[in-house]
A protein has these predicted regions:
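Secretion/assembly modules of Gram-negative surface proteins
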Residues: 14-21, 52, 90, 135
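Solvent-exposed loop/turn segments connecting transmembrane beta-strands
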Residues: 35-42, 74-79, 157-165
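Solvent-exposed loop segments that connect transmembrane elements
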Residues: 20, 117-122
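Cleavable N-terminal export/targeting peptides
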Residues: 1-20
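Gram-negative (and chloroplast) outer-membrane scaffold detector with strong preference
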Residues: 47-118, 127-130, 138-140, 144-146, ...
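Transmembrane beta-strand segments of Gram-negative outer membrane beta-barrel proteins
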Residues: 18-32, 103
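Surface-exposed strand-loop-strand hairpins of Gram-negative outer-membrane beta-barrel proteins
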Residues: 30-48, 125-126
Length: 176
């Protein structure tokens, strides 16, 4: 009896063998300025590093991201730079298909600034921001997946100009 209990406790489930709930990845894509930010800036780009935790058999996971967005100013001479550090919750919609749609949303620290090509002074302040969006995840193996997503980001900008900086990055990424 003790031997049977020992074997039962030592034998991992076939479904759980080799599963690692921790993920790391990267993404990049195009970023569209909207609202106040869309006035006077051009379409830009987004790059990000992702660290996540995805419990097995649950449709909810968490993702921490360090991202960088840059938008050129119309007329040249400067750019708007928005690095961010956010925590996000991902909810997968398990539909039993070869891809999985998901909703994502979170909040964190954004640091918008304007950089001048002539080397002029820049100003940057830490501001609160949030994001919400969705995507499609495509598993390529048990430990490797790719995704395509779009998220609306809104940053409450402090300082003399104030207002809200909003943008929508459309990205492609990989997770290991």
């Amino acid at each position: 009896m003790i031997a049977i209990l020992g074997l039962a406790a030592a034998a991992p489930s076939a479904q759980g063998q080799g599963y690692n709930p921790f993920q790391i990845g990267a993404s990049g894509g195009i970023a569209f300025p909207t609202g106040d930010l869309g006035t006077g800036t051009n379409t830009g780009y987004n790059i990000a590093v992702v660290v996540g935790y995805k419990p097995q058999l649950l449709p909810i996971s968490v993702r921490a991201e360090a991202a960088y967005n840059q938008f050129g100013r119309t007329g040249g001479g400067s750019s708007v730079n928005i690095p961010s550090f956010t925590g996000n919750v991902v909810y997968e919609l398990p539909l039993g298909m070869s891809f999985t749609p998901y909703a994502i949303g979170g909040a964190g620290l954004y640091r918008p600034s304007v950089g001048f090509n002539s080397g002029g002074a820049t100003s940057a302040e830490n501001d609160f921001g949030w994001n919400i969006g969705g995507g499609i995840k495509i598993p390529l193996s048990t430990s490797f997946e790719t995704f395509v997503e779009a998220r609306y980001n809104s940053v409450s900008v402090s300082g003399p100009n104030g207002g809200t900086a909003s943008f929508i990055p459309v990205t492609v990424g990989i997770l290991f």
